[in-house]
């Protein structure tokens, strides 16, 4: 795992955790908007490190590395943590372990529930193929296989593939969808998702509310998986700023 620092030391502390098949650079537009006001750390998940060979380990291992880093560098306290997809799953594990204090936690389309076991292997190989084609395909084949993707996401997948390749995608996917969030701790926990991923996201939101009735669910019209961060980083930045303006 790698930790990339941006912004202003001494300002409110913001931790960013990316998703499966992309790198920490997916956050660069958001970082550009917030670096004047926050002490920002963008995490690189093992298996998806930019320019570095690595292998995915486990949700618990990644969460443990984050906890250790925050304890060492930030006295065990973050003002805001934002996790996207796999990053949200890792963040939920950090909150479950309850070893550091996070004032505001954003789980953006985090998969908190396991899938039926029979479905995990076919889907993880399908997801691995998806990311492989992001890296290798151009022209007609790119259009045919990825008409449902937005271009910025394709570019991010290309960056991540060389690090852990298909094994990292398959191992990460299996780990995400065979683990269930059993408990969660935090003063302000938010779950975000877009309407275009509602079929998958709504059960996760219901599960979170069953564990933490005080959690806040935010639904973004017209947005797909990861699209709010990539298409509207200004809105994400504004919401983060609003969280900390009265702290």
Predicted regions and their residues:
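Flexible "cap/lid" loop of the alpha/beta hydrolase fold
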Residues: 96, 102-132
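Acidic catalytic loop of the alpha/beta-hydrolase fold
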Residues: 195-200, 226
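Conserved HGGG/HGGXW glycine-rich cap/lid loop of the alpha/beta-hydrolase fold
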Residues: 4-52
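Active-site loop/oxyanion-hole signature of alpha/beta-hydrolase fold enzymes
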Residues: 41-82
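Conserved alpha/beta-hydrolase catalytic His-Asp/Glu region
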Residues: 117, 133-183
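Short alpha-helix in the alpha/beta-hydrolase fold that links the catalytic acid
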Residues: 187, 201-210
């Amino acid at each position: 795992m790698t930790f990339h620092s941006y912004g202003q030391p001494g300002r409110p502390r913001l931790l960013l955790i990316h998703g499966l098949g992309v790198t920490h650079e997916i956050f660069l537009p958001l970082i550009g908007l917030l670096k004047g006001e926050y002490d920002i750390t963008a995490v690189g998940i093992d298996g998806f490190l930019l320019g570095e060979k690595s292998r995915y380990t486990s949700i618990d291992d990644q969460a443990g590395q984050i906890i250790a880093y925050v304890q060492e560098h930030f006295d065990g306290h973050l003002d805001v943590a934002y996790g996207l997809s796999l990053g949200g799953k890792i963040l939920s594990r950090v909150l479950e372990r309850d070893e550091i204090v996070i004032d505001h936690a954003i789980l953006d389309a985090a998969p908190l529930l396991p899938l039926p076991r029979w479905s995990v292997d076919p889907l993880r190989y399908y997801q691995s193929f998806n990311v492989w084609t992001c890296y290798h395909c151009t022209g007609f084949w790119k259009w045919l296989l990825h008409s449902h993707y937005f271009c910025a996401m394709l570019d991010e997948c290309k960056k991540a593939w060389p690090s852990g390749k298909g094994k990292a995608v398959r191992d990460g996917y299996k780990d995400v969808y065979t683990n269930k969030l059993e408990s969660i701790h935090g003063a302000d926990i938010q779950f975000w998702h877009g309407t275009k991923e509602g079929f998958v996201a709504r059960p996760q939101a219901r599960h979170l509310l069953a564990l933490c009735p005080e959690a806040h669910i935010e639904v973004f019209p017209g947005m797909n998986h990861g699209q709010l961060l990539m298409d509207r980083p200004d809105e994400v930045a504004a919401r983060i700023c609003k969280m900390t303006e009265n702290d």
